[in-house]
Swiss-Prot record:
Positions annotated as active site in the UniProt record: S122 (nucleophile), D239 (charge relay system), H269 (charge relay system)
GO biological process entries: acylglycerol catabolic process; arachidonate metabolic process; fatty acid biosynthetic process; long-term synaptic depression; monoacylglycerol catabolic process; positive regulation of vasoconstriction; regulation of axon extension; regulation of endocannabinoid signaling pathway
Sites bearing 3'-nitrotyrosine, chain numbering: Y58
Gene giving rise to this polypeptide: Mgll
One term under GO cellular component: presynapse
PROSITE patterns: LIPASE_SER
EC number(s) stated in the UniProt entry for this protein: 3.1.1.23
Further details from the record: Requires non-ionic detergent for solubilization. Short-term inhibition causes analgesia, while long-term inhibition causes tolerance to endocannabinoids acting on brain cannabinoid receptor CNR1, and a reduction in brain cannabinoid receptor CNR1 activity.
Stated name of the protein: Monoglyceride lipase
Catalytic activity: Hydrolyzes glycerol monoesters of long-chain fatty acids; a 1-acylglycerol + H2O = glycerol + a fatty acid + H(+); a 2-acylglycerol + H2O = glycerol + a fatty acid + H(+); 1-octanoylglycerol + H2O = octanoate + glycerol + H(+)
Length: 303
């Protein structure tokens, strides 16, 4: 069989023709997941995952939303999970935003009158913020879990940022070091699952990717004053990856008339995989918040 006719395969060597996927504007294949309720969905919710991970880690959260008659959908970002692309490398952070909007457009074609929400964690929070700012009237609300708004001051000091920018010109693929999994959660079993997950990129963050994250932080700062949609912001006070001060900055900067911040004292970065009392609270907060906003959005759609 000629090579040109061979099916495209995931980095794990599974043919994309056997998997749900979309093809982005650059011709890259992205692995997708869908959690569909049995009847007509009350809302569409796109889940945007964080750096180095994949959308399968949001199954528990998605299943909860599905039980509320919501259609949850997601994809592995370029360079992540089962999607194509060099691991944790992207030519421009806008690619993540563009792909999100493409996926939303695709799903909305089948449900044009159903309100759509965004849910983003960490880097996925930054992607969601930028998507919402790009389409200020498109989304009915947004849920942010430990979003990337401010980088951790220890890892993004002025000297380190300058060094990274210089290295990006000469050694863009050199590693800045691995993500320390012990700072993700106080739940050791969840940390162990993270460490053993073969779909997570456990290699170090490359300089070129770190620069894209810094660029995203700058873009988010400029976008926050344009965020007028309702949003729920969940943040751990002891987050060592995304500075918790960013949560307060977003609350101050956004002109939204419907914005809620829930700060979890002592909690780490991955709140939906934290100690049971934190994770249960997070799921409850999301459940309550999104159910109410769906009712409001549905009322607006009535003739």
């Amino acid at each position: 069989m000629p090579e040109a006719s061979s099916p495209r395969r995931t980095p794990q060597n599974v043919p994309y023709q056997d998997l749900p996927h979309l093809v982005n504007a650059d011709g890259q294949y992205l692995f997708c997941r869908y959690w569909k309720p049995s009847g007509t969905p009350k809302a569409l919710i796109f889940v945007s995952h964080g750096a180095g991970e994949h959308c399968g880690r949001y199954d528990e959260l998605a299943q909860m939303l599905k039980r509320l008659d919501m259609l949850v959908f997601a994809h592995d970002h370029v360079g992540h999970g089962q999607s194509e692309g060099e691991r944790m490398v992207v030519s421009d952070f806008q690619v993540f935003v563009r792909d999100l909007l493409q996926h939303v457009n695709t799903v909305q074609k089948d449900y044009p009158e159903v309100p759509v929400f965004l849910l983003g964690h960490s880097m996925g929070g930054a992607i969601s913020i930028l998507a919402a700012a790009e389409r200020p009237t498109h989304f009915s609300g947004m849920i942010l879990i430990s979003p990337l708004i401010l980088a951790n001051p220890e890892s993004a000091s002025t000297l380190k940022v300058l060094a990274a920018k210089l290295l990006n010109f000469v050694l863009p693929n050199i590693s800045l070091g691995r993500i320390d999994s012990s700072v993700l959660s106080r739940n050791k079993s969840e940390v162990d699952l993270y460490n053993s997950d073969p779909l997570i990129c456990h290699a170090g963050v490359k300089v070129c990717f770190g620069i894209q994250l810094l660029n995203a932080v700058s873009r988010v700062e400029r976008a926050m004053p344009r965020l007028t949609l309702p949003f729920l912001l969940l943040q751990g006070s002891a987050d060592r990856l995304c500075d918790s001060k960013g949560a307060y900055l977003l609350m101050e900067s956004s002109p939204s008339q419907d914005k809620t911040l829930k700060m979890y004292e002592g909690a780490y970065h991955v709140l939906h995989k934290e100690l049971p009392e934190v994770t249960n609270s997070v799921l409850h907060e999301i459940n309550t918040w999104v159910s109410h906003r769906i009712a409001v959005a549905g009322a607006r759609c009535l003739p």
